[in-house]
Amino acid sequence: METKRIHIKDYNYSLPDERIAKFPLAQRDHSKLLLYKHGEVSEDVFYNIQNHLPEGALMVFNNTKVIQARLHFRKSTGALIEVFLLEPYVPADYEQMFQTTGSCSWLCMIGNLKKWKGETLRRTFDVKGREVTLNAERREDVGKSYRVDFSWDDNTVSFAELLDSVGELPIPPYLNRETQESDKTTYQTVYSKIKGSVAAPTAGLHFTSDVLASLDNHGIDREEVTLHVGAGTFKPVKSEEIQDHEMHTEYICVHRQTLEKLIKHNACAIAVGTTSVRTLESLYYMGVKLEKNLDLSEDELHVCQWEPYEGETFEMAANVTPLKAIQNILAYLDRHSLNSLHSSTQIIIAPGYEYKIVKMLVTNFHQPQSTLLLLVSAFLHGDWHKIYDYALAHDFRFLSYGDSSLLIP
């Protein structure tokens, strides 16, 4: 299949608005679980998921945490400006960014841009009983976003504390409602740890401490990766063919322990969510790049959109097994005295893609004509219609707060 020539209209289905879950269930793990096993479709309840997994398998979770990325400023004229944080600029490191005090810069999307003529925006609010004034100054365009410089007048307050006080949690636009206080809890996974996402890795929302304990009791090995989900995850495919769609870039971090566990499991894993898929499959291509040069920079390990389909990396992949690719990354960490790999990926996974590491997938039900639906179709060798027809006919709830599926090709 010529992946680049795929027509997105071939990945459409009718999704009535009433099938989109606007709110989560009261109990996360009581969601429905669609089971696709070797072409057969059935269903169960999510809290029984361990019964459908092979004992001793490796399950990989994305431990990213959604930040309160929406900042609202009211101009003296009354105009409301929304500054939506996309990724840290100065400092560029996520961990440093959230610890920084006094000032920082982000790449942002700006709502009501035409009303922000360049003046400094200000907002005063309370942080731990102290009054703090936050200033925002718009700088240059950076691609399709803007650099915004923030400064605040209390050097004892970190940017993380500031966001917790004044920021608003971004929820998906298709929910068509305002963020509620309850979303601060329900739109985070119970294992979220590393701040940086502007959208949740929603396949993980169904897991509770009880379900995680059941996995442990079933002998499932659990490991975590970090991929900070960008706003591009909601970016619709507007081009007729996907070769004209530009994928967003997302930051990833994988620790030595996870790589060692992957090697123990012969580079085979169950991925929780499409973000874990993109991380694990990107690791393979990073390992391929390292096959002939262990002295690349972490930036040079970035996986470009079409690398798995064409060019030098694609050609080299024919001679690199998934296990060898992961071993190469571990050798790279050893060579450079690192405990974790920090890089980024722009990978697009669509029909024609050959999965390297992911053998089973836990995922929600995705929007029509989305790159996430392409990823699922690639995993099921085109059999996505069967599960979506079943889900629509059997009262499954769709999208971020909806029900789940376990896919075993």
Where are these regions (language model features)?
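Surface-exposed, charge/polar-rich loops and edge strands
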Residues: 1-409
